[in-house]
C-alpha cells in the first residue's frame, strides 16, 4: 500500500461501503434507531466532511461528532487567562491560528491583538522558540493546546530551550487528556453511543487499555 493513493481510491471506498452494509445486515440489533458511532479525532471529522463519507453511509449508521478539537472544548476561563497573559508587559503571545477567534468571557485573542497585544500565530512550539531566540528582551509565551499527542513536541521544545539556555521562553499549558473526556461521555446515562472510532495516534500515546 502506498498509503495516500489507496485511501483516495473511490472504487475501493465504494467496496468498503458495501462491506459495511453487509455487516449491518448481519448485526442482531433493534431497528428503532440507527447505529451511532462517534469519531473522536478532529482529523477523522475533517476527512468525513472532505470526502463526503457521511452522505455515502446507509441511513442505519449515524456518525456522531465527538470532542475531537481541544480548542473547541477549551474552558472559557482558560481563554481569559490567555488574553490576560497576552496583555502582559513585554510579552509576545504565540498561539495556533485556530485559537485566535475563540471567545472568552469578554475578549478573544484576536480582539486582544487588535487592542495592541503582541499575539502571533505559529504552526508549532518550535516556531515560538524561534521567536524567543529572536527577541531575547521579550517574554515569549506559547499557548500549549491539544490532547496527549501534542505534548511530546511541546516537551521537546522546552528541553531544547533549556539546552540552549533560552530563558525567555514560557509555555501556558492547557493540554487535555482524551481518556477522561471520553469516559465522561460514556458515563452519561443517555449517550446512546454504540461504538467509538478511536484515533490511532492517541492509542499510541495511551496504550491499548
Name these PLM-found stretches.
Residues 1-137, 151, 155, 159, ...:
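Metallocofactor- and cofactor-centric catalytic cores in central/energy metabolism, strongly enriched
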Residues 141-143:
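Internal active-site segments that recognize and position negatively charged phosphoryl groups
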Residues 168:
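Glycine- and acidic-residue-rich phosphate-binding/metal-coordinating active-site segment common to enzymes
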Residues 172-178, 199-201:
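Ligand/cofactor pocket segment of small-molecule handling proteins
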Residues 192-209:
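A conserved active-site cap/scaffold subdomain adjacent to cofactor or substrate pockets
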Amino acid at each position: 500500500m502506498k498509503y495516500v493513493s489507496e485511501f483516495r481510491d473511490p472504487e475501493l471506498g465504494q467496496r468498503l461501503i458495501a462491506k459495511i452494509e453487509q455487516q449491518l445486515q448481519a448485526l442482531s440489533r433493534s431497528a428503532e434507531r440507527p447505529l451511532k458511532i462517534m469519531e473522536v479525532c478532529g482529523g477523522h471529522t475533517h476527512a468525513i466532511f472532505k470526502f463526503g463519507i457521511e452522505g455515502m453511509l446507509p441511513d442505519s449508521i449515524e456518525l456522531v461528532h465527538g470532542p475531537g478539537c481541544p480548542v473547541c472544548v477549551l474552558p472559557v476561563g482558560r481563554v481569559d487567562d490567555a488574553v490576560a497573559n497576552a496583555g502582559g508587559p513585554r510579552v509576545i503571545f504565540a498561539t495556533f491560528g485556530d485559537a485566535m477567534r475563540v471567545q472568552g468571557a469578554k475578549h478573544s485573542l484576536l480582539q486582544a491583538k487588535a487592542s495592541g497585544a503582541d499575539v502571533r500565530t505559529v504552526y508549532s512550539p518550535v516556531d515560538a522558540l524561534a521567536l524567543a531566540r529572536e527577541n531575547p528582551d521579550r517574554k515569549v509565551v506559547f499557548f500549549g493546546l491539544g490532547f496527549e499527542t501534542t505534548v511530546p513536541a511541546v516537551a521537546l521544545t522546552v528541553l531544547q530551550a533549556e539546552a540552549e539556555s533560552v530563558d525567555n521562553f514560557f509555555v501556558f499549558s492547557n493540554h487535555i487528556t482524551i481518556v477522561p473526556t471520553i469516559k465522561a461521555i460514556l458515563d452519561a446515562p443517555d449517550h446512546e453511543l454504540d461504538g467509538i472510532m478511536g484515533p490511532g495516534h492517541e492509542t499510541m500515546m495511551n496504550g491499548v487499555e
